[in-house]
Amino acid sequence: MKAPSARAALSELPAILAELLDLPLSALKMEETVEATGASRANALVRTPDQSFAVEYKSSSKTAAVAKGIEQVRRAGAETGAVPLLLVPFLGGAARRRCRESEVGCLDLSGNAEITAPGLRIMVEGRPNRFKRPGRPSSVFATKSSRLIRWLLLHPAEAFTQADLAEVTGLDKGHVSRLTGRLLEDGLVNRNEEHELVVPDPLLLLDAWREQYDFGKLHVVKGHIPARSGEALMHQVSEALSEKARQYAVTGLAAAWLHTRFAGFRTVLLYATTSPANILAPLGFREGEPGANMWILTPEDEWVFKGATIIDGVRSVGLVQTYLDLKSGLEHSEEAAEQVKNQYAQAVDRARG
């Protein structure tokens, strides 16, 4: 089902808010400004007996669209004194989290919401997406396509022509043209005066990728190696693989610890181009789920190793891949992801001087 226009979406807004606030529909008064273009205008202002809400609608919950909506509705809320709310067809986890971090309320046309204001706390989640389309849409973050995204994130201070990007990524020029067109449309890249591509907000691009990244697609072999700690296990495995010159790199919480020293970990996640199970056998590696503290991941594309670095004698994927793989769902993953993202932000600042 196609996402509705702003006018159609706003026609549903009073009933949705009335239900969330447990008020009769007659208690809500809405002023629409659907065609608003001013920096401090929102699509609608909804007044209740106790509060006012500035509402901005975006027909997509993609990271770039959500970021623009948040910026717009925060300005409107600051000017009017109203509670800022972002309205989308369906709230994904990334959109909800970004709104929470920005102190902007959010709700969707599917019945989910997260709104915090003086004397008000609303949390509704788990309602299905009314606008889910059949099939899997093509994505600029698909396995091969994401090479272009990775290259831009690894070089945040540089500008590239489409020919440059085709050459370094190994993608054909037509594919690169389509990808850059989508990225330009979503506001994730811009063109400079020389018509080269630049990334205005690398953190926004990184979050957009993570939102689409599916850790569950990776082929994973789980097993157990006796070790006194996750750190000790990481060093044991690294030493064994380095001696055999295998291409490998740790990721997930182990990589986050190497990059940021944030939190201990029990389970080591490791990318390897070929199964290292035989090499790890002398360490006591036993394949199986119960008690698994070792996950061996088969990369879908060897570009996962781009940006890899050696820290304390252990080869780790770079900050970008670490941030993506912290979607593994293991303990402290989200907290570690914030630390890794902060470190990447610092690296961007250094690169841009």
Protein language model annotation of sequence segments:
Residues 148-210:
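Loop-centered beta-sheet repeat module
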